[in-house]
Amino acid sequence: MNKIPFEYGSIAENEYFIDRIEDRRDLKTFLGGGINVMLISPRRWGKSSLVKAAMEELKQEQKDVRVCYLDAFKIFSEEEFYNKFASAILQGVSSTMEKRWADIVKFIQSISPSLTINSDPVNAVEVNLNFKPLKESAEEILNLPEKIAKAKGIHVIVCIDEFQQLANLPDWKRLEGTMRSVWQGQHNTTYCLYGSKRHMMMDIFGTATDGYS
């Protein structure tokens, strides 16, 4: 049987990703220029593949860019979000395990982290964070990409897939308020937040006073 000449059900990369030239160009222009982006489209319409393709191109074009990817689809608690957020940041900005651990020690000072090594090469390192006062720890974690960007002289882009799923968390309002407060003050970090449920995404981003712009 001949192999099907396209990818389905997973992120299409390299020769499996074609076209969408204008979309890739726009994403690179906005995110590379420090403008936050929100994307909405149904599941399986290629948002994740588009973002990945555009960001991999941008990393080649702008050597100071580091891209961090987080999938929020299966996050079920505020603490889990912070753990996965920190893991995604460290994975995106540090090229080796030794550098990731050094970044943990240097940039996450109020938290006692432990390191979990997975066999999955895509998510090879996960960080488990032992929280002290949640408010202080949460703000430190959300500010992690900005602290690292300033210290290393880089531009960090954080891409969060299925962002609207976070609105289902029991403590969503607290999480949302903290994200808005912290992210508004960041100048070296840019966010690409994308999801498949239009009404939920519009509820999150639909007001002119939101803090994501």
Feature-to-residue mapping (PLM):
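P-loop NTPase nucleotide-binding core
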Residues: 42-45, 49-157, 172
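Helix-loop-helix "sensor" segment of P-loop NTPases
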Residues: 203-213
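Walker A/P-loop-proximal flanking segment of P-loop NTPase domains
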Residues: 1-45, 49-58
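Residue-level signal for alpha-helix termini/capping positions
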Residues: 31-32, 59, 150, 184
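Conserved nucleotide-binding/hydrolysis micro-motifs of P-loop NTPases
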Residues: 34, 73-77, 165, 196-201
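Short glycine-/polar-rich loops that comprise or flank the Walker A/P-loop
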Residues: 63-67, 187-189, 213
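Conserved Walker B catalytic segment
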Residues: 127-198, 206-208
